[in-house]
Amino acid sequence: MILRIRSRDGTDRITVPDPAAATVGDLQRLIAARVTVPVPLQRLSLDPALLLPSSASAALLADPAAPLSSLRLSNGSFVYLSYPPDARSSQPPPPKALSAAGSFGKKMTMDDLIARQIRVTRQEAPLCAAASFDRDSANAFQLHVAESLAFATKRAGFLYGRVDADTKEVFVDFIYEPPQVGTEDVVQLMRDAQEEARVDAIAHGLGMRRVGLVFTQAVGRKTSDTGEYTMSNREVLQATELQAEGGIPEWVTAIVKLEVGDDGSGDVHFEAFQMSEICVKLFKDGVLETEIGDKDDPRLSKMRKEVVAGGKDTMEVDNDFFLVPVKISDHQGPLSTGFPIENRGNPVAMSALKSHLDRAKHLPFVKRISDFHLLLLVAAFLDIKADVPALTACVKNQSVVPEGYQLLIESLAGA
């Protein structure tokens, strides 16, 4: 039986020779040999929460005599491993002696050499305390990918919402899906500057801003010969570039994927991460390679110069090194999500606006238009500096919509 051992440093595969007779203690010894983490320093769990900064709630596999057969593990199951930052016993090789580089060279001290090294280390805690998603927005996004795309191609969207200044929690209240083209391994965003300006104006009027990225992973995505991976090199690059552009320390990246069980049933899972600060710095400094070839290992990100990662000099870094897990939850946001969503193939027709307004005739007008996707359609006919702020202020405060705006929206619906 092959088990996947996921830690903050990546994912390793462990082969258990006799799973029917093996115990937790046997697994720990196999991990010690393969991952080089001594048994006394290992903390094992079947709960991925073990890898979060606050992992107190994760139930540990604490009894070394417990048989693995009692844990309902199967081939390919994940076991989560936590250990202190410096627990791995493998150490970097001793440095070579340094000498003057000819008559023109300056003799380098060990301190000089260390100062010039780029060290890639794990970031233990995210700058975003937690990420909460509006249930309806998250469901509308994953439902489209599941029912219309069958998780065959990638899909992405920008997350908009609020950041709690005190707790550093992010609340995602709507998802904007820009024009895009997706394949199994790449989603290319065909960004429309004018449309994004309207999106940002609507968000600002609602007291919100762009707070992150969400993308799906296709079931047929490229595999790696070197092991499992959470994000591919292309996904790491795209997420890092957008986090660098995002401009807030709490920026979050969410992954939506379909996990197929042994019985063939599929469950949709949301996971949230931040790209580590060192990853963003490597991108900004031009160290992270941005040209990715079709033959490159998707599990590894290439560097343009040597870095020190995992105690050794390397030109490639395991993508999991750059991921900082973020606790995820859900909430009921202030907006509805019943209006057709933009950029999903066919343009949204004005008849959809009429149908939407007619369905909710029993509600106050401001409630009927409290949907981001509806506001985005209407905003194309409004002044972005005067009308959009005025209309979104009504939605934010749930106040009466001025008659002029109501007549305009109703006339658009009747067009």
From Swiss-Prot:
<keyword id="KW-0833">Ubl conjugation pathway</keyword>
<dbReference type="InterPro" id="IPR029071">
    <property type="entry name" value="Ubiquitin-like_domsf"/>
</dbReference>
<dbReference type="Pfam" id="PF05021">
    <property type="entry name" value="NPL4"/>
</dbReference>
<dbReference type="InterPro" id="IPR037518">
    <property type="entry name" value="MPN"/>
</dbReference>
<feature type="domain" description="MPN">
    <location>
        <begin position="130"/>
        <end position="279"/>
    </location>
</feature>
<dbReference type="InterPro" id="IPR000626">
    <property type="entry name" value="Ubiquitin-like_dom"/>
</dbReference>
<dbReference type="GO" id="GO:0005783">
    <property type="term" value="C:endoplasmic reticulum"/>
</dbReference>
<keyword id="KW-0256">Endoplasmic reticulum</keyword>
<dbReference type="GO" id="GO:0043161">
    <property type="term" value="P:proteasome-mediated ubiquitin-dependent protein catabolic process"/>
</dbReference>
<comment type="pathway">
    <text>Protein degradation; proteasomal ubiquitin-dependent pathway.</text>
</comment>
<comment type="function">
    <text>May be part of a complex that binds ubiquitinated proteins and that is necessary for the export of misfolded proteins from the ER to the cytoplasm, where they are degraded by the proteasome.</text>
</comment>
<dbReference type="GO" id="GO:0006511">
    <property type="term" value="P:ubiquitin-dependent protein catabolic process"/>
</dbReference>
<comment type="similarity">
    <text>Belongs to the NPL4 family.</text>
</comment>
<dbReference type="InterPro" id="IPR016563">
    <property type="entry name" value="Npl4"/>
</dbReference>
<dbReference type="GO" id="GO:0043130">
    <property type="term" value="F:ubiquitin binding"/>
</dbReference>
<dbReference type="GO" id="GO:0005634">
    <property type="term" value="C:nucleus"/>
</dbReference>
<dbReference type="GO" id="GO:0031625">
    <property type="term" value="F:ubiquitin protein ligase binding"/>
</dbReference>
<protein>
    <recommendedName>
        <fullName>NPL4-like protein</fullName>
    </recommendedName>
</protein>
<dbReference type="InterPro" id="IPR007717">
    <property type="entry name" value="NPL4_C"/>
</dbReference>
